[in-house]
Every structure is written in C-alpha cells, then in structure tokens.
C-alpha cells in the first residue's frame, strides 16, 4: 500500500530518483510451499515511480505538507492496518532481506511447503520417507526463520544506534573517499558516471549450469523497479515501536537473489530491492565473511531525498551557488521554490553516490554468496541422494518382508481352499445321491402321471369324437330344415314379389287415374288397391288424415282471422304514429324558429358589446404605448450615460493592468533567468543526466542485452 502524495510532491522527482526501501512479494494462497516465488517489486513501485522530467512543486502548498520526504513513500508498517488483512500482496522489509542475506538464507526457503509437493517431486518415494523429509524440512525452516528473526532484531538495533549516534570524522572521510571513487569507476565503463555496472550473472551462468533441484527453486526474473522509495528518518523514528510487525514480511517474502543475478542492471535501478540471498542452509555467517553493513558503513542507514535535501550541508551548498550566480550575472534574489529544486537536485546526486557504494558492496557479496550457494546445493544434493538411497533400501526391505508375508498368507489360503474343496466335494456327492433318488422318484411319478394322462386323453378323445359326430348330425339336420324353410320362404317371397309387382302396377295405374280425376278419387283407388294388406291401418290413417285436414283447415281459418286483425291493428298504429310524428316535426320547427330569433338577438348584442370593448382597449393601448415610449427613451439615456462611464473606467483599468503586467513580466523574466542559471550551475556541478539521455542509455542497454 502506498501513502497518498499530492501531485506537487510527485512532480518534483527527476526520472529514476524515487528510491526504494521496500519490495513487494506476491504469495498466492493456493501456492504456499511452492519453490518458485512470485515476481517481487512489480505492483507497488513499478506503477508509482515512472521516470519523467522534473516539475517544480507549488511553493504555496509547501507549509501544509507532511514532514516526510516529498517523494512517493512505501509504508513499512501498512500490513498492520485492517485494510491489509487477507491481501495477497505483502510488503517485505529491507531489514528482513538483509537478515536473510547475513544468514545465507533465501526468503523463499522460509515459506512452508506442503507434503504433496515433496511427494510430487520424487514419485518413487514411499509416504514414510516423504513424511520424514517433510518433518526435517519443517524443522530446518523453523530454525532458519528463528535465526533470521534474531538477525533482523540485531539489524534494527544497529540502525537505531546509527540514527541517534552521529558519524565519526574517520567514517565520514571513508564515505567521501568511496563516493569519489564510485564515479571514476563508473565512468570507465560504457555508460556515464551515474549508470550502473553490468551484473556478473552471464559469466556465472557460463561457469556452472544449475542442477535440476536448483532450477526448480529459481523464480522467474522479476521486473526491475523504475524508481526507488526511501523511508524517511522521521517516519522511522516515529514508528520504531512497531518494527516487529515486519516479521511476517520476512516469512512471506518471495525474494530470490539468483534470479536478480541473472538480469542486467538497468539504469537507476534500486539497490534495496535486490538484496542477495543464499540457498537453503541453516548455517550462520562465517567469521571472515563481510556483510553488506561491514563493507559499506552507510548502508545500514535508510535515507530519503527529504533527509538529504533538508540537511545543513545541502542548504549551505545551495546558498553558495545562489551567491555565485548573483555575483556573476548581477541578477536579483532566487525564489524559495527554485532553492528547493536546486537542493533536491543536489540531494539526488548524493543519493546516487550512496547507491553506487551499496551496489559495489552488493556485487562483491553476491559473488561470494554464489560460491556458497553452489557448495550448499552440491551438499544438499548429496544429502538428498543419501536419503533417497536409504529410502530405497528401506523400501526394498519392506517389499521383501511384505513378499514373505504374502507367500505365507497365500500358502495358508491354499490349504484353507483345499479343505473347503474337500468338504464341498463331500457335500456335492451327498447332494448328488439325494438328487438322484429325487430324480428317480420324480421319474416314476411322472411315468404314472403320463399313463393316467394318456388314458384320460383317450377317453376325452373318444367322447369328443362322439360329441362331434352328434353335432355334425344335428348340424346336418338343422341345415336341411333351414334349407327347406329357406325354400319355402323364397317361394313366399317370390309370390309376395309378384303380388307386390302386380299391386305396384295397379297403384301406378291408379295414381295415373288419380292425377286425371282428382286427389279424392286417387285416395279412394289407393285404399281399394291396398285393402288386402293395409285395410285396418288404412282406415285409421284415413280417419286421422280427415281429422288432420279438418284441424289444419280450422287452424288456417284462425290464422287468417288473426292476421287480418293484426293487419288492421298495425294499420291503425301506423296511422297514429304518422300523426304523432307530424305533430312532433311541427313542434320542432316552431322551437327552431324561436331559437334562431333568440340567437340572432344575442349575436347582435355581443357584436355591439365587443365593439365597445375594442374601442376602450384601443384607447388604453395607445395610452400605455405612449407611456412605454417615454420610459424607453429615459432608460436609453441612462444606459448610454452608464456605458460611457464604464468604458472610461475600463480604459483606465486596462492602462493600469498593462503597466502592472509589464512590471510583473520584467520581474518574472529576471527571476526565471536567475533560476535558470542556478539550475545550470547545479547541473554543471553534479553532471546530472537529462531525461532524453537516460532514455537513450536505457535503449542502448536493452539492445546490448538482446545481443
């Protein structure tokens, strides 16, 4: 997490000058125990410290700022706040990395590993051997963690002692000599005095290729940080009580020194986020091996640009440059804002010199750590091979023991199976005998049942044949009787058909005669023609017909009478309705005439009243128009006089502003010339590179790395 910093403070940084005291370690929750750490220092500093040209901070907001450095800061204690709980990103303190470097321990070796990872690395191991290796690894990891925590406490005590103890003159002279030798060493290389030397990683990679185990532990190369974050002395003194909280950062760091040695140093890269670390070993520092703090006395202190730019030496240096510019150019005083910019430029130059010293010490320490790491890897490989051989022998002994036990169990099982087989054979023979007896009994019983069934079937067959014979005889007799009845019925039908044909012919003749003589005579002839078969029914039908005819005649007469009565009533109703309609129309005509007369009278009255109102409104409008015209003329006169007065005031104000602007422009030009000469003087003394030059150097380094 990053402290919020105003834009004015961010604008005061030159490219590559935001120093870093923190490294960000990304530890995913599902990859605890993995040997490949995530890329560090990529999320906190890469986005916060982008190189850009210097922008002057606002002098008016200078009084309300914090007492810390004006640059962007990383908070060493922000993982104690509630907002950081459950975050995947943990800030790793540089003290933790320094403690790991002193103890020759890689921070990734302090991470816990799962038992499944050890089993996955060596599929041939048994679970007992893997469990033993896991317990040994955990014990070694806890010992290393305790050792690194103790070393970190010792580093914190040394830093506190240095913070409150001024440097001796001898130490100051040694630091100045180292600062003087660093630029000369840097200028002999292909880059400028402020650029970094190339890392010896390619040479180390050509000397010894990594073993399979070490290749697994090497993390992917982390992206170089574009800026440096410095923890100010004031913030450190205020928060020294909560320094113990960074132990979690040491245990969750994903830092690896070998991955950084495999990269070339980009220009102005941080020296704090590339602290060397050894491989997995719990040995402490050798008595003759120098640490980073013993090589360079100043590396134990944590500086920021705010600390360097507010120091008395920087203030005296800036004052001397200002006096020199006044004497040479004869200009007026330099503003406080430009003085702060000059002090910041000098502080950056001092910080670069300090970082050069730290890098030189780190490169020497890295070379020594590489040799020790190679020896430790070889020793660990031998120990792993020895443990693997022991595991194989134990596994072979267990296999032999299991094989003998399995043979005994198989022989015992064979004997049990033999006894069971013999018992089953006896039971099978007894069962076979019983089944044979049962089969013979069933066969005899089935034979008896078959004989009885055959006898019964023969009897049933005889009875069925006799029944069939009787049925055939009865059927033949019935068929003959049916044929006789059919013949008689056919004869009767033929006689009936002939009679019907004769009757039909007579009926046709009678119908033809009835058409000529009339319906009454036709009905009488039909009754005479059908009297042989329908005499009784025809009489009733005739009676019914006569009754129906009479009833129909009566109904027709009644209906005709009702229709005539309804016709007379409808005619009377129509005449009455016509008379009523005629009277209604006459009444409507009279009412319409009355309404028309009333409407004509009302319209005439409305026209007269409207004419009177129009005349009155015209007179009122004429009076209002004359009053408005007089008012507009008066307003125009007032506005014209006010406009003339305002134009006069504006002309006077414009002349005054022109005079003030001319004087302010002259003053600003004089101040700008003084500020320019002060900055040029500071650049000449510090030989600071420009942003374009840094871009060209970065492109050159990138092309050399690709080659």
Swiss-Prot record:
Q: What is any Pfam family matched here?
A: DUF4659
Q: Which domain of life is it from?
A: Eukaryota
Keyword annotations for this protein, in alphabetical order, are: Coiled coil, Phosphoprotein
Keyword Magnesium present in the record's keywords: the answer is no
Q: Which residues carry this modification: Phosphoserine?
A: 311
Please note every region of biased composition (Basic and acidic residues).
377-392, 399-426, 454-484, 491-514, 543-581, 618-637, 652-664, 677-707
Q: Where is this region: Disordered?
A: 1-65, 183-294, 372-426, 454-581, 597-637, 652-707
Q: In this entry, which stretches build a coiled coil? A: 364-605
Which ranges are annotated Low complexity under compositional bias? 38-49, 183-215, 243-258, 665-675
From the Swiss-Prot or TrEMBL record, give the protein name: Coiled-coil domain-containing protein 177
Protein's organism? Homo sapiens (Human)
Query: Which gene is this protein's source?
Result: CCDC177
């Amino acid at each position: 997490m990053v402290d919020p910093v105003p834009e004015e403070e961010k604008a005061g940084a030159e490219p590559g000058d935001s120093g870093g005291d923190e490294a960000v370690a990304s530890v995913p929750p599902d990859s605890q125990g993995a040997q490949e750490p995530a890329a560090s220092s990529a999320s906190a500093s890469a986005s916060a410290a982008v190189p850009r040209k210097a922008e002057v901070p606002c002098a008016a907001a200078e009084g309300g700022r914090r007492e810390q450095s004006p640059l962007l800061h990383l908070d060493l204690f922000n993982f104690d706040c509630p907002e950081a709980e459950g975050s995947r990103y943990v800030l790793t303190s540089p003290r933790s990395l320094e403690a790991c470097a002193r103890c020759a321990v890689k921070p990734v070796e302090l991470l816990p590993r799962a038992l499944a990872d050890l089993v996955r690395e060596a599929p041939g191991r048994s679970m007992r051997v893997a469990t033993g290796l896991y317990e040994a690894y955990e014990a070694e990891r806890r010992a290393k963690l305790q050792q690194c925590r103790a070393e970190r406490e010792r580093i914190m005590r040394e830093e506190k002692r240095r913070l409150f103890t001024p440097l001796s003159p001898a130490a100051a002279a040694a630091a100045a000599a180292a600062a003087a030798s660093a630029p000369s060493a840097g200028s002999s290389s292909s880059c400028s005095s402020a650029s970094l030397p190339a890392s010896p990683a390619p040479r180390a990679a050509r000397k010894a290729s990594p073993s399979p185990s070490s290749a697994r532990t090497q993390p992917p190369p982390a992206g170089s940080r574009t800026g440096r974050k410095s923890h100010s002395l004031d913030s450190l003194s205020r928060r020294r009580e909560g320094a113990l909280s960074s132990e979690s950062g040491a245990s969750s760091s994903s830092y690896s020194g070998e991955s950084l040695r495999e990269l070339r140093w980009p220009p102005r890269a941080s020296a704090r986020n590339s602290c060397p670390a050894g491989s997995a070993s719990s040995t402490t520092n050798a008595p003759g091996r120098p640490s980073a703090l013993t090589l360079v006395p100043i590396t134990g202190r944590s500086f920021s640009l705010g600390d360097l730019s507010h120091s008395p030496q920087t203030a005296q240096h800036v004052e001397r440059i200002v006096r020199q510019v006044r004497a040479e150019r004869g200009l007026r005083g330099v503003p406080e804002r430009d003085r702060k910019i000059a002090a910041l430029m000098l502080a950056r130059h001092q910080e670069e010199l300090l970082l050069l010293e730290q890098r030189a010490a780190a490169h020497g320490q890295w070379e020594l750590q590489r040799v020790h790491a190679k020896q430790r890897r070889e020793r660990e490989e031998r120990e792993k091979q020895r443990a693997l051989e022991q595991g194989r022998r134990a596994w072979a002994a267990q296999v032999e023991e299991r094989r003998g036990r399995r043979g005994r169990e198989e022989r015992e099982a064979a004997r049990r199976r033999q006894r069971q087989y013999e018992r089953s054979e006896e039971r099978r023979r007894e069962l076979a005998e019983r089944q044979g007896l049962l089969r013979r009994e069933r066969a005899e019983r089935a034979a008896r049942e078959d004989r009885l069934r055959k006898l019964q079937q023969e009897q049933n067959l005889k009875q069925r044949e006799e029944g069939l014979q009787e049925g055939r005889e009865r059927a033949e007799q019935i068929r003959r009787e049916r044929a006789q009845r059919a013949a008689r019925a056919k004869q009767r039908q033929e006689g009936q058909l002939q009679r019907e044909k004769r009757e039909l012919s007579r009926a046709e003749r009678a119908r033809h005669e009835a058409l000529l003589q009339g319906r009454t005579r036709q009905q009488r002839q039909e009754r005479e023609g059908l009297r042989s078969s329908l005499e009784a029914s025809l009489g009733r039908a005739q009676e019914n017909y006569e009754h129906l005819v009479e009833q129909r005649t009566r109904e027709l007469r009644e209906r005709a009478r009702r229709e005539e009565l309804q016709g007379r009533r409808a005619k009377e109703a129509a005449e009455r309705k016509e008379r009523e309609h005629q009277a209604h129309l006459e009444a409507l005509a009279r009412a319409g005439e009355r309404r028309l007369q009333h409407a004509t009278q009302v319209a005439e009255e409305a026209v007269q009243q409207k004419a009177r109102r129009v005349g009155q409104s015209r007179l009122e409008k004429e009076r209002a128009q004359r009053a408005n015209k007089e008012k507009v003329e008066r307003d125009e006169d007032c506005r014209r006089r006010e406009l003339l007065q305002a134009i006069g005031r504006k002309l006077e104000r414009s002349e005054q502003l022109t005079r003030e602007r001319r004087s302010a422009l002259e003053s600003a030009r004089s101040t700008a010339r003084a500020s320019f000469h002060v900055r040029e003087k500071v650049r000449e003394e510090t030989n600071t590179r420009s942003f374009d030059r840094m871009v060209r150097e970065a492109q050159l380094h990138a092309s050399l790395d690709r080659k």
